[in-house]
Structure formats: C-alpha cells, structure tokens
Amino acid sequence: LSTDHDKLSPDVLAMLSEPETVLYISTESVRELIVAYNNKGLGNKEWKTAEDMVHSIEETYYLEILPVQKEVMYTYSRLRINNTQNHRDPSDHVIISHAMTLKMPLISSDTRFDYYRKQGLVLIFNEK
C-alpha cells in the first residue's frame, strides 16, 4: 500500500491513473498485510489497528477486496511451482492462482512471477 510513486513504473502509474481502472486485492494479500502490521513490519501513522488498515485499503486506496473462492484452490492445486528460482512462498502461489482463476492481470515487481505466464497468468511487471 504505497503512495510512493518512485516504486511504480511509468506504465503502471499511467494505468492506475486512468479513471475507469478498478483495482482489486486478494484476501490473501490482505492477510499478509495484517500479519506484517501485527508483527510491526508495516506501519502507518494513520492506522491505530490492523482493522483500521483494512478499512483504509477499501476507503482510502479504493481497492476492492476479492474473496478467495474454492475455484482458486483448484487452480492452486494444479499450479506448477517455479523451482528454478526457489519460489516457495505459498501466499504468492495463492495470489497468482487467484489472478489466473479470475483471468485478471496481476501487477507485481517480483521477477519470479514471469514463470507463471505460460500457465495463464497475465502479469503486468512493475519494473522499479
């Protein structure tokens, strides 16, 4: 949840600034943010609690939180893991599966995600 435009590539910034662009976030990403907040790895002066942060995701950042449906778990169960780059993060795999199942593009700066394009991931790479 960065408002630091230096962390976004010009292409991603342009896409995000389009008025008709609707932004979504997986419940798995929200879960990761809550864990980071509770472990003091994520902070913001405006958030007093993790719940405040979740409200901010929707109300300040205008992201729609998408629940993980069982169909996502079927995609996840079939996902071939990027062992070449030792990509073993199960949360990343759920987020990738979520995007693939819903046929939605995924914005990420993680170079390991490119591997999943051949399985159906539509990746918008954010080159920092």
PLM segments and residue spans:
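Residue-level "hotspot" positions that anchor or transmit function at local structural transition points
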Residues: 86-87
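Acidic, PIN/NYN-like endoribonuclease modules and their adjacent C-terminal/linker elements
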Residues: 94-128
